[in-house]
Amino acid sequence: MEKLSDITRFREHQNIILQGFDPVSAGGFTQVPNCLLNQANLSFAAKVVYAKLLSYAWHNNRVFPGQETMANELGTSQPTITRAIQELEDNGWLEIQRRGQGKTNVYVLKYVVGEGRRG
């Protein structure tokens, strides 16, 4: 129970209030690297798509959702997802393994320290 008290103490001193939030039972959560969030040359869409790919990945080491599925879940268009994925690939945050016509791609998520590659 010591860890629970540590969490309670942390919540008392933070500037963000998590009302009614239980990360264990609320459908999970996704950790996103701060260096990705702070990378000014990446668009907002690219950062959100990377986070979405991470949310799929925690079940195993391979991620292969369809772009249409991601667009529907994120409330955006498939072309926006396609551009964001290309941007992430150009900057070294992911590698795309194409599996052929009519099949979803496999996305290898990478961790880039610093600025990443500029495409």
Show which residues each predicted segment covers.
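A short, conserved structural fragment
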Residues: 90-98
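Short, cationic-aromatic polyanion-contact patches
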Residues: 66, 99-118
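Short recognition helix of helix-turn-helix/winged-helix DNA-binding domains
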Residues: 1-80, 87-89, 102
